[in-house]
Amino acid sequence: MRAAIRDYAFVSPEFPKAMLARLEAGHVIDPHRDGAGSNLLTHKIHIPVQTNPGALFCAGGEVRHLALGQAYEVNNIGEHSARNDGAQDRIHFIFEVFENAPEGRREVAV
């Protein structure tokens, strides 16, 4: 996770949440906005660990394929969606990072 955020130059990063998220082949995540809460304070990073050319992500009016092994910051407060038109499931490793996480947010949820 630290390698994925190196360019942010955090002094004291905290990683309160990490998960694997699967989007099955042929499935869609409809356009939505994640709730505010701590999302206003965190950077949400997606790293595709299994993907295919038909796995697409839409945010800010832009549709793109997120390449295997690359790290992408996603603004999940803005409207976003995803679709997987490929034959293989898409799996992303997703984690949150704060600079000096607020008290009570230092636990890791996996």
Where do the PLM segments sit?
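Short beta-strand His + acidic residue motifs that chelate non-heme Fe in jelly-roll/DSBH
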Residues: 31-32, 55-57, 74-75, 79-87
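Short, conserved beta-strand element in jelly-roll/cupin
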Residues: 22, 39-54
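Signature of the catalytic double-stranded beta-helix
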Residues: 1-20
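A short hydrophobic beta-strand segment most commonly corresponding to one strand
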Residues: 42-48, 71-73, 87-105
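Conserved short histidine dyad/triad with adjacent acidic residue
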Residues: 20-38
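A short beta-strand-loop-beta hairpin characteristic of the jelly-roll/cupin
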Residues: 48-68
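A short secondary-structure junction signal
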Residues: 29-34, 56-61, 105-106
